[in-house]
């Protein structure tokens, strides 16, 4: 039985591939030719080269596949990436799901995002809270929300697919690194001079991998499962990083409203004069940190059997891995 993993060189994909190999599964990785494949070095993984924007390469990669984990996505808060976000996250996912159904793939797990989950003003959001593509938000959030509609449409047409919605993932094997990984490295190297107070859900990588595997085995077709970890304040995370890295945390807290005002001025200037620069933040990211958004993973615990682990331990795992790689 062959299991195909898209996004196998990414943070989640690298961890998921290792978990699948540990279970004795035959793994095929769907990767772009220009991708850095360090995450797969030394692993007994078949490589299928292609692109989510190329239907023919998708079709070839799915040949003989019984299980599919779709973890690939383009993640960016840069305005200049709007078209690529749509092409990869929406059109690419649509073609992959269509071809998976036509190829007779038995089971699919689609990795969406907590960004595609709506805000519950009364408390924690569960699987029933959705995001409209017309709401204020990042283009990434919009594309992940729209792509879920395509996934559910294919489920209606007969594809046995389940959706997983992780929050901000923390953990090892972060080769690129991820946004959370870059934040850890910035902290460890003293590049973080100040911070914006706020809070968000941070989830251990081991929990996300567990839900991916459990969703494949037990998930209901066309349904979502949240895995959102702990709701952590930025101050709490900075304290953990100070303890884990030995580097003092920044003490200067910039008021969120002030940073939102700065972002309203910065974002259009960046869009106009530096369209290819990757911003550290924008208006919507600051807004999200102070939106009160939090997730409810009780369905994953109740129906799939998830046993949540410590988010602080996940940060410790990430720091230890970066140290082993000589990056800290």
UniProtKB/Swiss-Prot annotation:
Biological process, per Gene Ontology: sterol biosynthetic process
Superkingdom assignment: Bacteria
Pfam families reported in the protein's UniProt record: Epimerase (PF01370)
Catalysis performed (reactions): a 3beta-hydroxy-4alpha-methylsteroid-4beta-carboxylate + NAD(+) = a 4alpha-methyl-3-oxosteroid + CO2 + NADH; a 3beta-hydroxy-4alpha-methylsteroid-4beta-carboxylate + NADP(+) = a 4alpha-methyl-3-oxosteroid + CO2 + NADPH; 4beta-carboxy-4alpha-methyl-5alpha-cholesta-8,24-dien-3beta-ol + NAD(+) = 3-dehydro-4alpha-methylzymosterol + CO2 + NADH; 4beta-carboxy-4alpha-methyl-5alpha-cholesta-8,24-dien-3beta-ol + NADP(+) = 3-dehydro-4alpha-methylzymosterol + CO2 + NADPH
GO MF term (any one): aldehyde dehydrogenase (NAD+) activity
Segments passing through the bilayer: none
Swiss-Prot/TrEMBL keywords: Lipid biosynthesis, Lipid metabolism, NAD, NADP, Oxidoreductase, Steroid biosynthesis, Steroid metabolism, Sterol biosynthesis, Sterol metabolism
Keyword NADP: yes
Disulfide bonds: none
Cellular component GO terms, alphabetical: cytoplasm
EC number(s) stated in the UniProt entry for this protein: 1.1.1.270, 1.1.1.417
Pathway where this protein functions: Steroid biosynthesis; sterol biosynthesis
Annotated InterPro entries: Epimerase_deHydtase, NAD(P)-bd_dom_sf, NAD(P)-dependent_oxidoreduct
Its biological purpose: Participates in the biosynthesis of bacterial sterols.
Homology family: Belongs to the NAD(P)-dependent epimerase/dehydratase family.
Protein name, as recorded: Sterol demethylase protein B
């Amino acid at each position: 039985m062959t299991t195909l993993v898209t996004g196998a060189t990414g943070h989640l994909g690298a961890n998921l591939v290792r978990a699948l190999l540990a279970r004795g599964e035959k793994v095929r990785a769907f990767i772009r030719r220009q991708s850095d494949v360090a995450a797969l070095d030394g692993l007994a993984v078949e490589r299928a080269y292609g692109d989510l924007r190329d239907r023919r390469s998708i079709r070839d990669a799915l040949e003989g596949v019984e299980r599919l984990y779709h973890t690939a996505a383009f993640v960016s808060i840069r305005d200049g990436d709007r078209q690529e976000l749509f092409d990869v996250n929406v059109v690419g996912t649509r073609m992959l799901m269509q071809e998976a159904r036509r190829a007779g793939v038995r089971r699919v797990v689609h990795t969406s995002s907590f960004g595609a989950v709506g805000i519950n003003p009364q408390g924690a959001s569960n699987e029933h809270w959705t995001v409209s593509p017309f709401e204020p938000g990042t283009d990434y959030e919009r594309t992940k929300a729209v792509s879920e509609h395509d996934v559910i449409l294919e489920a209606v047409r007969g594809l046995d697919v389940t959706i997983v919605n992780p929050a901000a993932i923390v953990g090892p094997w972060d080769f690129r690194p991820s946004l959370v990984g870059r934040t850890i490295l910035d902290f460890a190297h003293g590049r973080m001079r100040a911070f914006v107070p706020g809070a968000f859900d941070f989830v251990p990588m081991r929990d996300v991998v567990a839900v991916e595997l459990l969703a494949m085995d037990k998930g209901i077709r066309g349904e979502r499962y949240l895995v959102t970890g702990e709701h952590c304040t930025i101050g709490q995370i900075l304290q953990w990083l100070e303890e884990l890295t030995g580097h003092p945390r920044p003490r200067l807290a910039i008021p969120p409203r002030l940073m939102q005002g700065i972002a309203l001025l910065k974002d259009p200037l960046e869009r106009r004069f530096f369209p290819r620069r990757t911003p550290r933040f924008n208006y919507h990211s600051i807004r999200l940190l102070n939106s009160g958004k939090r997730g409810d993973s009780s369905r994953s615990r109740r129906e799939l059997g998830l046993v949540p682990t410590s988010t602080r331990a996940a940060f410790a795992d990430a720091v230890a891995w970066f140290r082993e790689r000589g990056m800290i």
